[in-house]
Regions:
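Active-site beta-loop-alpha junctions enriched in small/polar residues
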Residues: 44-46, 72-75, 106-109, 133-135, ...
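Histidine-acidic metal/acid-base catalytic patches
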Residues: 4-40, 50-62, 191, 198-207, ...
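Active-site acidic/histidine proton-transfer and metal-coordination neighborhood
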Residues: 10-12, 16, 75, 103-208, ...
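Flexible, glycine- and charge-enriched loops at secondary-structure boundaries
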Residues: 51, 80-83, 87, 144, ...
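Short, well-ordered coil/turn elements that cap or connect secondary structure elements
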Residues: 94-99, 164, 171, 203, ...
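Generic enzyme active-site microenvironment
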Residues: 68, 177-179, 209, 280-282
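Charged helix-capping and loop-helix junction motifs
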Residues: 56, 83-88, 151, 155-162, ...
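N-terminal pre-domain/capping segments
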Residues: 2-127, 133-134, 152, 207, ...
Length: 307
């Protein structure tokens, strides 16, 4: 399943006891000379390579230096993105390649929490994050598109749903988080939808996965948002933004860390300051995904001062 189908169909780790404490993760990182989160990738970046040869792609990621990954497209037993493998076999493939998978994205319809939780436990996940709520997805000229919020009433309903789903996952031993795009920063009725949603959801039930590339696309300072939501951000998506790329497709302007306009030294410093334990490299659209992961990894490792 590609992300367009995944999002269109229905369409992370500070204070929860279910997750490894940020302090311990930071100490582990310093043990190998690095200041910052362990090298990690959102697997959607390398979806084509995984589809061709799952184990080969995982070996390639491990050779680059990736030790953590985030899964995507987990919607329930009928369409989970498990690459044709039972959940336990997929976990074994990750384990054999020394890659931990603590988080997965889930579909925007926010259904099937029980079934998803069962799969998550089999995979050894600690958290799930909604990639894009169905309220913000639609079609334009017959093609998938992200659509802005319609108004306060819609946002009130979504906030209520996020709290309810967050409670359902908490009761099943999982942390629930919200992953942003740029569309939540399009004002409606004088409101910034993202800010309104975060103000009207329970921080204990709805954590934050902050996508710094989409924040930059929206003209928002990632460092300011990391500090604003200190203690609530469980992970970041680390992608860069290049406004000079000529494209009507916003995903095309999202590039590997170090290839755009974002100050990742400042982002990593803010992540350390606010104790965000995980950061996943992601490039939404890539002509050479593994090369982009390597480029982003090299840049971030340099900024983290790795030995």
């Amino acid at each position: 399943m590609n992300r367009r189908d995944f999002i269109a169909r229905g369409t992370t780790l500070a204070a929860s006891s279910a997750l490894a404490p940020a302090k311990l993760l930071s100490q582990a990182a310093r043990a190998d000379g690095c200041l910052g989160p362990a090298p990690a990738v959102q697997l959607y970046t390398v979806r084509d390579a995984l589809g061709r040869d799952l184990r080969g792609a995982l070996r390639s990621l491990r050779e680059i230096g990736i030790v953590e990954a985030e899964l995507y497209g987990l919607n329930g037993p009928e369409n989970a993105t498990l690459f044709g493998l039972p959940a336990r076999d997929l976990k074994r493939a990750f384990d054999e390649n020394g890659i931990r998978v603590p988080i997965s994205h889930i579909g925007g319809d926010l259904m099937s929490s029980g079934a998803i939780a069962d799969i998550a436990r089999a995979l050894g996940l600690e958290a799930v994050c909604v990639a894009l709520p169905s309220e913000f997805s639609g079609t334009v000229d017959g093609r998938f598109a992200m659509v802005p919020a319609k108004g306060r009433a819609q946002l009130d309903g979504l906030a209520e749903k996020l709290n309810r789903v967050g409670r359902e996952y908490r009761d099943r031993g999982l942390t629930f988080g919200y992953h942003n795009h740029h569309i939540e920063f399009t004002r409606v009725e004088g409101l910034v939808p993202y800010d309104y949603l975060m103000s009207n959801t329970d921080p204990d039930l709805v954590k934050i996965e902050l996508d710094v590339g989409w924040l930059a696309t929206a003209g928002v300072d990632p460092v300011a948002y990391l500090r604003r939501h200190a203690g609530r951000v469980i992970a970041c998506h680390l992608k860069d933004y290049d406004p000079k790329i000529a494209s009507d497709v916003p995903q095309r302007k999202l590039v590997p860390p170090g290839s755009g306009s974002i100050d990742f030294a400042a982002v990593l410093a803010a992540m350390r300051e606010t104790q965000v334990p995980r950061g996943f490299i992601e490039v939404d659209v890539s002509d050479d995904a593994l090369l982009d992961v390597r480029r982003g990894h090299t840049h971030l490792q340099m900024l983290k001062g790795c030995a």
